[in-house]
Design a protein with these regions (language model features):
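Glycine-rich anion/phosphate-binding loops
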Residues: 10-26, 61-66, 109-113
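Surface-exposed, active-site-proximal loop segments in enzymatic domains
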Residues: 1-9, 46-57, 96-102
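Generic serine detector
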Residues: 3, 11-14, 33, 56, ...
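Extended aliphatic helical segments
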Residues: 2, 16, 23, 41, ...
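Second-shell residues forming the walls of enzyme active-site clefts
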Residues: 59-173
């Protein structure tokens, strides 16, 4: 990428996200790529999370949406598809989801006001794809399952029909 999310957000100017995406998209198209696995729309709620620390835009929901929309616009103007990630949201704890399952332990209401708002608004704006993370969201899995699951029954979004079908596809659209 041309710039990381944190550096982009530090500019306090969503046009930086747009311009970085245009440069990256132009370069990627020149070598035959038509799909960008970005932007990262995780929220940095735990500074110890080394995966999200510099890759996310920030902890602010509305600013994250603003920068992501600008990034998506810049990328798609280069005829590239974009991917928002890592559903259901990284950045709340310290686990590296590439090594072990991350756990987004927010309750359903808090999740909807934060990560849910980010995903919902970007889906409504027409983002092309969403990447699931190896991250569990126990509150939503239990709510959609309609029962109190034991901890060993909690699955990451990559393997969880309640999160992918129930939450992402049916509730968020």
């Amino acid at each position: 990428g041309v710039s990381c999310g944190a550096a982009t957000a530090a500019s306090r100017d969503s046009q930086v996200a747009y311009k970085a995406a245009k440069v990256g998209g132009t370069e990627a198209m020149a070598i035959g790529s038509n799909w960008n696995f970005a932007p990262i729309v995780d929220l940095l709620y735990n500074w110890r999370n080394t995966i999200v620390q510099t890759r996310s835009f920030c902890a602010d929901v509305d600013r994250t949406i603003e920068y992501a929309k600008a990034f998506i616009k810049g990328t798609e103007e280069c005829d590239m598809a974009t991917t928002i990630k890592h559903f259901p949201g990284d950045g709340t704890e310290e686990n590296d989801q590439h090594l072990m399952m991350g756990i987004n332990d927010m309750d359903c209401d808090t999740w909807m006001e934060t990560f849910g708002k980010v995903y919902s608004e970007l889906i409504d704006a027409g983002v092309k794809t969403i990447m699931a993370g190896h991250i569990a969201q126990p509150a939503w899995q239990r709510k959609i399952a309609g029962k109190d699951l034991d901890d060993h029954e909690i699955l990451p979004a990559t393997l969880c029909p309640e999160l992918i079908t129930g939450l992402l596809k049916e509730k968020l659209g």
